[in-house]
């Protein structure tokens, strides 16, 4: 009887090596670890201005095909304020708002300057209030409420914002309202997100910036945790930059209050920044600290966080890849180890981290570095404006005749604008395509542009113009010289005849 060969024992992890690949007794080859995809640097990509839309449901029939459309009671056409502070919903009032006009409250009360981002959640616009002239950010939901539950879920974000309250490191909510089944949130205007800043930078952020962002975000988390609130979605896309190297924490859509009845129905955020205890359903303030630790690791090392796999497991077992963290200072590495502790009970809290000497007070050299970077950015913009002014003056001095030459009438009358400009609704000052009225068809535009030309017209009446009505009729007799048809071969022979 043949004896079974002894099973190979799994190699135990040594100092400086990542944890074992799995806990199974199946032997793992020594070279198997090299076949697994390791950690990598971030790949260059475009600025993150939007999120991918949600995939459509393929196994269900739209409700509009089963039931006739009807307007629910909460689908108000008039704007109504949304608040969970005990205030009753009331109609919004603004000096520039006229309820009799077809435009919405958003269109009448704000001047839209640009779109900051869009995705499946909705759109965010940079606007200027017509009431006080200040700049704000307005978040508008993409689609109307699908039902009472969907409306309650979207309006819960307003309640989460109101629970946060006022803090210098948290994005401030100005007001919220609903109109026509659409939710609007007006917040203070911040700079780009930390994710957009890193993508524009294209490399690891300087450690001076990292310390400042870490301290400000810890202050925001300490404010939330003191009220029993957990953010559950801390990541670079939800951290917004401000002046002088400061930052603010925003997007409280997944905020949960510990000890409430709805705490069991929480939603996790991005899996790349998820704490390991969330897989067991254990929600606490330590999850935000872990997510912030991965955020700092990503921006300080320009590291691409894995969505899953062995690298995802290693980061949640306390392993920090030395090929990325070798360039960090010993203080920052120690803070990352405290924040990425696998056990949430042993993980450092936001208050404990802020009590460290390296985070107790903002570093003077870090603040000076951020101020110097901002000054250089403004100086570069000023230099470009000055250079453009000098070029304009040089052109005027080199060609003084252009200054003295009077501006006469144009040599040719201006032509009609091209069809593409007339059909382009982006040049209109209206907000939506529906407000443009009946659209112009290409035939109508061409009918208006026929006869319009940039070349000078001759002084002739339409009667003197070329008449094309009889182009297919027979020509009048005697208008062309008569000729006798001949054979082509005979014509060729005549050309060859020397006589």
Curated annotation (Swiss-Prot):
Entry keyword Magnesium: yes
Annotated Protein kinase domain residues: 110-359
Modified residues (Phosphothreonine): 17, 495
Compartments, record wording: Endoplasmic reticulum membrane; Golgi apparatus membrane
Residues at the catalytic site: 233
Residues making up the signal peptide according to the UniProt record: none
Motif position, Membrane-association motif: 382-398
GO cellular component: cytoplasm; cytosol; endoplasmic reticulum; endoplasmic reticulum membrane; Golgi apparatus; Golgi membrane; membrane; nucleolus
Molecular-function GO term, any one: metal ion binding
One Gene Ontology biological process: meiotic cell cycle
Binding site for Mg(2+) 2: 253
Catalyzed reactions: L-seryl-[protein] + ATP = O-phospho-L-seryl-[protein] + ADP + H(+); L-threonyl-[protein] + ATP = O-phospho-L-threonyl-[protein] + ADP + H(+)
EC main group: transferase
EC numbers: 2.7.11.1
Bilayer disposition of the protein: Peripheral membrane protein
Activity control summary: Negatively regulated by hyperphosphorylation during mitosis. The hyperphosphorylated form does not associate with CCNB1-CDC2 complexes. The PLK1 protein kinase may be required for mitotic phosphorylation.
Residue numbers spanned by region Disordered: 1-29, 42-72, 451-485
Record: residues binding Mg(2+) 1: 238, 251
Record family assignment: Belongs to the protein kinase superfamily. Ser/Thr protein kinase family. WEE1 subfamily.
Domain notes: The membrane-association motif is essential for the localization to membrane of Golgi stack. According to some authors, it is a transmembrane domain; the existence of a transmembrane region is however unproven.
Annotated function: Acts as a negative regulator of entry into mitosis (G2 to M transition) by phosphorylation of the CDK1 kinase specifically when CDK1 is complexed to cyclins. Mediates phosphorylation of CDK1 predominantly on 'Thr-14'. Also involved in Golgi fragmentation. May be involved in phosphorylation of CDK1 on 'Tyr-15' to a lesser degree, however tyrosine kinase activity is unclear and may be indirect.
UniProt protein name: Membrane-associated tyrosine- and threonine-specific cdc2-inhibitory kinase
